[in-house]
Regions:
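Glycine- and small/polar-enriched repetitive beta-structure motifs of secreted/surface proteins
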Residues: 1-186
Length: 186
């Protein structure tokens, strides 16, 4: 179902597209992928509801159940894993989320990288964060320019900025502090 103007696009699935009025070069596989798409180009969506709300966003890649589901106009985002970048919305560009529920609540932040299930899970608007490891930067909401490498590194950080935590549970209890460097366990 959906529109009929599928210029250079491949679409497979039930109710898989919006109107695709001027959209080109899109690949969609799964139920309700690209349900709102109008003019976004060169997107890839694989998995139920992936890129479901995308209207004009360009060059996004979503693989997994509801990956990048809320994206409407964001560009150059990559989400791999169920619920990865689920709530990302207008104005969120150049984000990469790999792992189940990574960056699930991000709405408008740019340039974030999350690798690991539930990494950067609570992020809403921060930018330029790097989280690698299960639950790294888990509760970070608006803190920017943080680097967390290791399981639960910077786990409790909410608004602290420009921190570097390397190692499992490094800077575990930091919530708002900034400009810290920790290497090793908590």
């Amino acid at each position: 179902e959906g529109g009929t103007n599928f210029t250079n696009s491949l679409l497979v699935g039930t109710s898989s597209t919006g109107t695709l009025s001027t959209a080109t070069g899109n690949i969609g596989v799964g139920q309700t992928v690209f349900a709102a798409l109008t003019s976004g180009d060169n997107n890839v969506a694989v998995g139920r509801d992936s890129l479901k709300c995308n209207t004009t966003g360009t060059e996004n890649t979503a693989v997994g159940n509801q990956a990048l589901c809320g994206n409407s106009t964001g560009n150059y985002n990559t989400a791999v894993g169920s619920f990865a970048l689920l709530d990302v919305d207008a104005g969120a560009d150049n984000n990469t989320a790999v792992g189940r529920s990574s960056m699930i609540t991000l709405s408008t932040g740019d340039g974030n990288t999350a690798v690991g299930a539930q990494s950067l899970r609570s992020a809403t608007t921060p930018g330029n964060n790097t989280a690698v490891g299960f639950c790294a930067l888990y509760t970070n909401t608006t803190g920017a320019s943080n680097v967390a490498v290791g399981k639960s590194a910077l786990l409790s950080n909410t608004t602290g900025a420009e921190n570097v935590a390397v190692g499992a549970t490094a800077l575990l209890d930091n919530t708002t502090g900034g400009n810290n460097v920790a290497i090793g366990l908590e």
